[in-house]
Amino acid sequence: MDKIKIVIVGLGGVGGYYGGLLAKQYADNPNIEIFFVARGAHLSKVQANGLTLITEKGTFQVHPTLATDNVTEIGTADYIIMTPKSYDLDSTVAQIKPIVGANTVVLPLLNGIDNSDRIRTLLPGTEVWQGCCYIVARLNEPGIVESSGGVHRFNFGYEHKQTNDRLIAFESLLKEASIDATFYENILHVIWTKFFFISSTASLTSYFNVSFGALLTDETRKATLVSMLEELILIANAEGAEIERTVIDKVIHQLEKLPFETTSSMHSDFKAGKTTEVHGLTGSVVELGKKLGIPTPTYLNVYNELLKR
């Protein structure tokens, strides 16, 4: 049988954790090859010593089939798992083009609701799945990725509730590598459910320049949050995500459970003057609203203000 080639593009916390478990599981399997695409000092360390993966179940040193910044060394991929930041998606797609063949599946695992559509536009005719993950993992230093928190969910599927043999087979490949993977027929519901929290809270912690907890202690801030979530419900359901209005209470409950002073990654990036995911987490809602003919006045106001920063 032909070898199955799984390529992990982006070896930060998310890519490093899932890629590391895949490399660990299939190191001695002659039929499955695992490739890491990374760059810089991190790549050099992995090429020299392998990837060190620190998890709640122990610390492992894993070695992929190949770690490289030159995808032409890989050949045509069967599965490509992409984990860049949303603002790097277009350049990352351009990077992987040489390894995309007629039967390649591309699976983005990054924040946002428009990633798969963006990839399909850039790679016409390619089978693009959809996914999202719940995980706390980070790149500690070059060559070392650490996960914490005990949650590592890897959710994926194909749009319009499609099922095929490859989806089922891929779920098995992941589970055999001790990855908490679930194939969902209605993956849109899963992705949108996560997006309700990350989009609204990232946008508003940045807009108001406050912590998660402070979003709920002021009536104006809380009302703005509810308004954004109401706009999202209309858009998500127009897209077929089947979201109930109870999502508003769920987001508020999630915020209440978090330490008061914690904040979103996007807010931290704004404060540090770094590139942010404001388009993927805020602007994409405005664009989708325009496309669907659904007004998003709260999102539009927040997005326009954030663009000035």
Segments (PLM) and residue ranges:
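NAD(P)-dependent Rossmann-like dehydrogenase/reductase catalytic/cofactor-binding core
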Residues: 2-4, 31, 175-176, 226-309
